[in-house]
Structures are given as C-alpha cells and as structure tokens.
Amino acid sequence: IANANPNIEKAQQTLDALYQNYAATNTCLLRENYPFDQDNKATYLASEEQAKRRNEYSYLWPYSGTFSAVNALLESTENKKYKKLLENKVLPGLEEYFDTRRKPFAYSSYISSQPLSDRFYDDNVWLGIDFTDSYRMTGKQAYLEKAKLIWKFILSGKDDVLGGGIYWCEQKKESKNTCSNAPGAVFALKLFQATQDDAYLKEGKELYEWTKKNLEDSKDHLYFDNISLNKKI
C-alpha cells in the first residue's frame, strides 16, 4: 500500500519481509533467525541450560516485537488489515507462549508445549503495554483483561528488597533491572489511563521514583542496567 509517509512504507515493507523470511510453515510462529539454524543459541536468556536447547521457533522476546510492530502500523495507518493480522496471526502465535502451569499466569520465554522455560518480567511488561494499546485502539475488552492479568504477574515480581522494584527474571531473582522497572512504570500508567483505577497510578509513580533513585546515574542521568541484591550496580 502506497503511503505518503516514507517511514510507514518502510515499516510495512519490513513487516512483510519478516513474515516472508521468518514464518514457520503451517503455524503462526516465527523462526529465531534467518537462514533458519536450530543450533543457534540465544544470548539473552537467564538459563544456560535453556540456551543450549535446540528450538524450532523464536523465543518470546523477538516474537513479541511483531505485536508492537502491528500495533504501531494499526495506529499510524488505521488500516483494518493490521487489525486482522493482529487477530489472525500475531495473537494466536503469542498464545503459544502463554503459561498456565505456573501461577500467576504469564508468558514464558518459549512455547508452553515444550518443557518449562524462564519467565521474564520485562518481556511481560512490554506485552502488557501492547495489550493496553490494543485495547485503546480497538475497545476490545479482552485485551484490557489480558493486560490486567499480566500486571498481576508483574506485581508478583515486586517486593521490599532494595526498597521496592521489580526483578528481571522470575526464576533468577538476583537483580532488579531498568528494563523491567522503567517500562513497568509506563505499563502501570497506561493501565491507569485505560481504567482510571488509582491503584495503577500509585504503582506507576512508585516504580518511576524507585527507578530514578536506584538506577539513574546522577552524573550523566543515564540509567544503569541493573542493581544486584547486594546493591552492586
């Protein structure tokens, strides 16, 4: 589809190329890499054991980018084909990662039909943001309910260690990271906008303040990657 905005056109072309080259035949899932190599090892996992597994499909983190991409194109173009793509391809594939074997329910780093995999708070935060944005654009209540469900998982990763904050990985609670707390604040505040529930506003403000206090470099105002439980940056 021709579009006056060259960035939107590039985004459309990139998404088309993604599905053309990474799609796993007869599924809604994607490959981890191109050309496909099942021996490829992901470098962004918390578990070395999991990283050594041979996997036919992508992990959640790269797959979830399609949700953000389609949301952005839907908002930018208002083209209903992206709403259909979301409903018929992106979200059915995403549900392959939804883990109901552990509570609270959440999205795991690999498809749930395989052995249990780690669950990352930052991965789920971004999905929660996307579900909230989808609700805002479509008014579909199911999207808001999924966002609320994800928020329950996020809160399960928050405690009083270090005065608050969200861990990075459910299975390895060794650090509290900028990547889970800064967007966690965004997620909470988006939920507040969607629901007008003051509990989300309170949580969003607390996460924002905690992140600035514990992870911001006071010299250059950039943010450190994480703070460990022994307060080491």
Per-region residue spans from a language model:
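Glycan-recognition and catalytic cores of secretory/periplasmic carbohydrate-active enzymes
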Residues: 2-233
